[in-house]
């Protein structure tokens, strides 16, 4: 019998006390933005250390700014490495975007979809990996405009993965959000992703501003079309580790576990279907 698929949850400070008592068995790993935890001390710091000593953690960064025209903040990367070494965390992902340029921009901005940007990002990926002594996994991001685009989002993303020879954190919700906002076929985009490059998945909720505009919020339950896209993702690319993101409007843990268990159910069905095809 095959082991079940892995499902994780983004850790928030509000969860620390409860999870230090007992982490629900449905949660296989936790993910944190290192920027929010690197300088944490006191009670929260002790609770966090307790959890990292007992459970599997991934890091998902916010401030690397891999696509910025400004030089990489190498001291920041070294602090990330020290944090990951301290807590024995192996997985580090970041957004394929930038958040600095003539100062910090306080948002994740899309990188121009150009050949020059592909090569620029690839060089910086290797710089980061050399310091971290770990792979850098890049995430497809939601975006609302594509300035100076010379290629499609799909062409840009796959070109970066190939040029940098790196893995992909595939955000299923971002595919759906972008497909509505930029009017493309979400399923076709999903199927075009290189299976061998996908490291793990993100799934989250979004806000419907209008029929033509969705906002990637991570502040609500997962929507039905995103569940359907996740189901298609497992069928197309296999059952991959999947993380539920919920950044605000945090419900009770029991409610989050309902979604986590639903992810497990989709994974189990996909595994069963694969086993039937093999048999």
UniProtKB/Swiss-Prot annotation:
SUPFAM superfamilies the record matches: Xylose isomerase-like (SSF51658)
Source taxon at top rank: Bacteria
Secretion signal span: none
S-S bonds: none
TM helices/strands, residue ranges: none
NCBIfam families (alphabetical): PRK05409.1
Family in the record: Belongs to the UPF0276 family.
Protein name (Swiss-Prot/TrEMBL): UPF0276 protein SO_2008
